[in-house]
Amino acid sequence: ETKMKFISWNVNGIRACAGKGFMDFFQETDADIFCIQETKMQEGQLELDTPGYHQYWNYAKKKGYSGTAIFTKQEPISVSYGLGIEEHDQEGRVITLEF
């Protein structure tokens, strides 16, 4: 029997959350896949050290708005960003990983 732990968390701003114990929780849970929503950051604003995990981020074009990230222990076969609908894909709301 194969078991996997999958966590999804709407952090409502990862930069503030990172200063309030996010990394401790992340490490303690030891999830196989950890997804976060509402990262509300732009590329380069924060780097999270997650040894043993592959990181995938989708940033919103609008500063301080939406955004998603996935951390996974197993490297996916493929990764895609967005829905293929331009008006929605600017919000960084969707990341699809295929295993």
Predicted features along the sequence, with ranges:
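Structured beta-strand-rich core segments of catalytic domains in phosphoester-bond hydrolases
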Residues: 40, 46-99
